[in-house]
Amino acid sequence: MKKQRNLRSMAAQAVEQVVEQGQSLSNILPPLQQKVSDKDKALLQELCFGVLRTLSQLDWLINKLMARPMTGKQRTVHYLIMVGLYQLLYTRIPPHAALAETVEGAIAIKRPQLKGLINGVLRQFQRQQEELLAEFNASDARYLHPSWLLKRLQKAYPEQWQSIVEANNQRPPMWLRINRTHHSRDSWLALLDEAGMKGFPHADYPDAVRLETPAPVHALPGFEDGWVTVQDASAQGCMTWLAPQNGEHILDLCAAPGGKTTHILEVAPEAQVVAVDIDEQRLSRVYDNLKRLGMKATVKQGDGRYPSQWCGEQQFDRILLDAPCSATGVIRRHPDIKWLRRDRDIPELAQLQSEILDAIWPHLKTGGTLVYATCSVLPEENSLQIKAFLQRTADAELCETGTPEQPGKQNLPGAEEGDGFFYAKLIKK
C-alpha cells in the first residue's frame, strides 16, 4: 500500500518546477503519479493541469490578497496557495476539505510556520470572492494567456483570437485512432458500446473517434493489443495529405513519440518506414508504440538539419516533417506551454524549421510528396514559413492545401474539436 501523501504540496512543487525551472509537466507528472494511489492519480493531474491552465488568474488573485509575494525558499508556498485557490474556484471539493488539505501541505514542504498565513489568505479570498472576481473579469488577465502570446494571436487572427483563447482554456476531448488493420471504425465502436462507453466518429478523418467521456487507456477495448491509439483528430489529419502507399519508402522526420509513424503503417502496412528524431530519450516511446501495435520500422536518432549523417544520399517517395514548433495549437492539452514558451522562441523555431526544410528537400524523389505539419497556430511557423520556402525552392509546388499567397491548411483549436494544427502538402516537380 502506497504511503498517504499530501497531493496539494505535490501539485505545488510540480507547478513550481514548470514555472520557475522551465520543466515540462509531461516529464514531471508521471513519476509523481507513481507515488500516489490509483484513486489519487486523477486528482493530482487535475490540480497540476488546472493550476497551469488558470495560472495568470491565480497569480492576479494572490497579488490582490497579499502585500508581498513569497520569494526564495518560501516560493513553494506561493504555488501551494494557488492550488488552494484553484480548488475553491474550479473543483467540487468541499471548501473546508480544500482548505484543510492545502494548509496541511505546508508541513509536507517543511514550512509548518506558514500554515496560519495560508489559511488566512484562502479565507480572505472566500470573504472577498465576489468583488475580486468582478475586478478580475474586467482585466486583461481574464484571458489566462501571457501578454506576448495574446498580442501574436490578436495580430494573426483579429476576428478569431478570442475564440482561440477560449478553446485553449477548455479541457481537451479525448480522441482515439482506430487501427484499421484490426477493426473497422464501426466494429470497434460496437466493442466500445459493449464496454459501456460511447464514442463519436469524426466527419473527415476515417480512423478518428472522440470519447464522450475521457477514460483510462486500459479500459479501452484492445488497447494493449494495438487496436486503438490515443491521438488527437488534427494529428490524424496528416495521413489525409500524406496518403502513404504500400511499397513506398517513407520518412517520418521528428517522429517521436511515434503516433504518426504507426499511423503510416496502419494505412500502408507494406511501406518501408524510417522514423527519425533528435531526442534519443523520446525515441524509446517510438519503439514502445511500434511494439504495442506489432509493427516494424527503421528507427534512427538524428538531426533533421543534417540528413546525410543518418540516411546518406537516400531519397524517399514521401516525407512527413512534423516540425519542432511552439506547440501553441495544443495549449488546452498542455497548458504549461503558455508559461514555458517565450516570445523570442518564435523566430528561433522558424529559423530551425527553415533549415530542416531546406536540408531534407533534396532527399525527396522527383514527383514525391512532402507534408509539412506543426501543432502551432502562428503564421511565422506555418503559412509564412511555407510561402518563403516556395519562393526560394524552384522545384517545390503546393498541392491541395491553400494558395501560393496563403499556403497551407490551418486548423484552429476547437474547430471540429481537434487541436490547432497546420498542414502544407508539397510536390517535387
UniProtKB/Swiss-Prot annotation:
It comes from Escherichia coli (strain K12). One of its GO terms (biological process) is rRNA base methylation. It comes from the Bacteria. This is Ribosomal RNA small subunit methyltransferase B. InterPro entries: MeTrfase_RsmB-F_NOP2_cat, MeTrfase_RsmB-F_NOP2_dom, NusB-like_sf, NusB_RsmB_TIM44, RCMT, rRNA_ssu_MeTfrase_B, rRNA_ssu_MeTfrase_B_ent, RsmB-like_ferredoxin. The keyword S-adenosyl-L-methionine applies. Belongs to the class I-like SAM-binding methyltransferase superfamily. RsmB/NOP family. CDD domains: AdoMet_MTases, Methyltransferase_Sun. Specifically methylates the cytosine at position 967 (m5C967) of 16S rRNA. Keywords: Cytoplasm, Methyltransferase, RNA-binding, rRNA processing, S-adenosyl-L-methionine, Transferase.
